[in-house]
């Protein structure tokens, strides 16, 4: 839970610290996946320092904007849904893709701990939003693949991610 802030801006790109604390470079004049260049969580020690940031609290949402968007969409008869990234997609924003993939293979218990914290946060966030708004649906997205295949084995998915996706 970090405020998004601009670190550097040029005519070609903007570098920001994004909401999970990661440093991202976004190109202005071309379409590209943001280039993530640094992460606050680099190992178990920095994970333990970071972990409390994945606790639910009322400041996680911009309630005024959420209410305005909700009411405007509702007045237009739109399909209203709660949506968030979960699992691999969220974890790569916290520790980075390369570090995450290596840890899936070499330190799965660490990744399970991060998944547990992330899942608890998303469940609490969903419950909080459902206590205030009425949704027509829910969408939990998780991008675990690259072009032609998954980023890790089905066995790793079953062992590490599936138990938390079920929750």
Question: What is the predicted role of each segment?
Answer:
Residues 1-6, 163-167:
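Short intrinsically disordered, low-complexity coil segments enriched in acidic
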Residues 2-56, 75-79:
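A contiguous, low-structure linker/loop signature
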Residues 15-17, 44-167:
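Active-site loop segments of alpha/beta catalytic cores
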């Amino acid at each position: 839970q970090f405020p998004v802030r601009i670190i550097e801006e040029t005519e070609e790109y903007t570098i920001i610290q994004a909401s999970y604390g990661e440093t991202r470079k976004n190109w202005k004049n071309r379409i590209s996946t943001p280039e993530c260049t640094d992460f606050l969580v680099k190992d178990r020690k920095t994970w333990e320092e970071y972990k409390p940031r994945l606790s639910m609290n009322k400041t996680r949402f911009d309630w005024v904007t959420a209410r305005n968007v909700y009411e405007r969409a509702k007045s237009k008869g739109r399909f209203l849904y709660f949506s968030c990234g979960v699992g691999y997609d969220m974890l790569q924003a916290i520790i980075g893709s390369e570090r995450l993939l290596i840890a899936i293979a070499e330190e799965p218990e660490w990744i399970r701990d991060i998944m547990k914290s992330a899942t608890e946060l998303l469940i609490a966030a969903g419950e909080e939003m459902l206590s205030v708004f009425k949704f027509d649906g829910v969408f939990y997205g998780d991008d675990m693949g690259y072009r032609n295949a998954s980023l890790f084995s089905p066995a790793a998915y079953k062992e590490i991610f599936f138990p938390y996706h079920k929750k």
